[in-house]
């Protein structure tokens, strides 16, 4: 089975304060160990969003880059989508409903029968965005990326 894992810094393997351990601790490595007969394709990009447009680094928008990711890795049996945390940043004026629509857009694109006409449509697993806790307001960097609305929308998604 070929499993394409599309995600953000969590898929990329970000570990606070321990960048040297990034490659060995990311969840895709654990998945590969649990499924040694499968091919795990890691597509993690720090800062990647579902639909939010990052004006500084535009290639971080998932819906814009999804076609390239899908076409470059066919055939794929399963796509795991683990995105959404970055869409909750205050600069994007986050809304849980908008985030849910973005995930639906991802799913529709992956299920598009014209995407890869000679291959079957892959199964899809959506992993909920990482739940933001109150501590993020105190621990974030000087950019102040998350605010109270970010926390509210994260809680709404968790329900």
Predicted segments, located by residue:
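Alpha-helical cap/lid subdomain in secreted, periplasmic
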Residues: 60-159
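Serine-esterase "nucleophile elbow" of acetyl-processing enzymes
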Residues: 1-46, 51-56, 69-71, 79, ...
């Amino acid at each position: 089975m070929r499993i394409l894992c599309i995600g953000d810094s969590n898929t990329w393997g970000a570990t606070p304060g321990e960048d040297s351990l990034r490659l060995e601790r990311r969840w895709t490595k654990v998945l590969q160990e649990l499924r040694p007969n499968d091919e795990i394709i890691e597509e993690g990009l720090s800062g990647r969003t579902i639909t939010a447009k990052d004006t500084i680094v535009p290639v971080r928008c998932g819906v814009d880059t999804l076609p390239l990711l899908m076409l470059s890795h066919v055939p794929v049996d399963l796509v795991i989508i683990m995105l959404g945390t970055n869409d909750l940043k205050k600069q994007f004026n986050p809304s849980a409903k908008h985030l849910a629509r973005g995930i639906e857009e991802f799913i529709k694109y992956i299920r598009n029968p014209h995407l890869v006409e000679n291959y079957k449509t892959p199964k899809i697993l959506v992993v909920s965005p990482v739940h933001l806790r109150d501590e993020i307001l105190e621990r974030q960097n000087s950019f102040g990326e998350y605010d109270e609305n970010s926390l509210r929308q994260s809680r709404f998604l968790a329900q």
